[in-house]
Each structure stands twice: as structure tokens, then as C-alpha cells.
Curated annotation (Swiss-Prot):
Name of the protein: H/ACA ribonucleoprotein complex subunit nhp2
Coiled-coil intervals: none
Cross-referenced Pfam families: Ribosomal_L7Ae
Organism, as annotated: Schizosaccharomyces pombe (strain 972 / ATCC 24843) (Fission yeast)
Localization, UniProt: Nucleus, Nucleolus
Length: 154
């Protein structure tokens, strides 16, 4: 029975899924990744997660940003209450770390290989051990996302 529910969730296309999450977005969810970039972002998160080059959750992400780790922070745009993650964009700007919002904490959690919805993740190329040999799998899409972030910030 549980499998049927999961199948229903993914039966639509990603565009329909993206649009269905838009009404739940918080007003501070800017810069929000457009559909195409959102899809690329989720694939990159999934690949980075397989290599263990990802930090999940507010506590881990804040700790890494404060320590000066370089990477990409991805925040869920439908977190309630928004105070949970409202300090992270300011922290990222102070430390020159690019950040983006995605439409859903469920999609972000699924992409980062957890069964739970995830409020924020940080892709850290090389991971905690700085093992750059496994970065090649997602490096190209990671760099494309990083290039598109400044254009989205308004």
C-alpha cells in the first residue's frame, strides 16, 4: 500500500510537480531556481550525495559556512516556520557562498538520499576529506549551476 502512494507522487511530469509546489513558497524564497535549473540541481545533489560530498540540515550547513567551507547551499522554499532557515542567506552572503532556493523540502530530501524532507543542503566538492577524485561525476553540472546563480539574484 505504501508503494502505491509513492507511485502516485511521481506519476506526473516534473513540470507539473514544480508548479504544484509554488503556492507553498515563502516570500523570502529568492533567488528561486527555475524549472530547468531546479531539475539540474536535484540531479547534481543526487550525484554529490552518492559520493558523500553533501551536508544535510541547518546545523551542518551553518557550521560549514561559518568555518569557511566553499560550496553551493540549496534551501527549500516551503519551510514553515521560515525562521528556521531565514538566517542562512545572510550568512552565505557574508561568506561569499552561493545559494539558491528550490521549491520543495520533499524533493530536496529525496535528491539527497534521505527519507525525510530536508530544509537545506550544501554541496561541498571533495566532501569533508577533500577527496577531489570523485568530483568529476557532477563537476560540470555543479559549475553550470554556480555560473547561473548571479544571474538569478536581483
Amino acid at each position: 500500500m505504501a508503494k502505491d502512494k509513492k507511485d502516485h507522487k511521481h506519476s506526473g511530469s516534473t513540470e507539473d510537480e514544480y508548479d504544484s509546489y509554488l503556492p507553498a513558497l515563502m516570500p523570502i524564497a529568492k533567488p528561486l531556481a527555475p524549472k530547468k535549473l531546479n531539475k539540474k540541481m536535484m540531479k547534481t545533489v543526487k550525484k554529490a550525495s552518492k559520493q558523500k560530498h553533501i551536508l544535510r540540515g541547518v546545523k551542518e550547513v551553518v557550521k560549514a559556512v561559518r568555518k569557511g567551507e566553499k560550496g553551493l547551499v540549496i534551501l527549500a522554499g516551503d519551510i514553515s516556520p521560515m525562521d528556521v532557515i531565514s538566517h542562512i542567506p545572510v550568512l552565505c552572503e557574508d561568506n561569499n557562498v552561493p545559494y539558491l532556493y528550490t521549491v520543495s523540502k520533499e524533493l530536496l530530501g529525496e535528491a539527497s538520499n534521505t527519507k525525510r524532507p530536508t530544509s537545506c543542503v550544501m554541496i561541498v566538492p571533495g566532501g569533508k576529506k577533500k577527496d577531489m577524485s570523485k568530483v568529476e561525476e557532477y563537476k560540470e553540472s555543479y559549475e553550470e549551476i554556480i555560473k547561473e546563480v548571479p544571474a538569478l539574484e536581483v
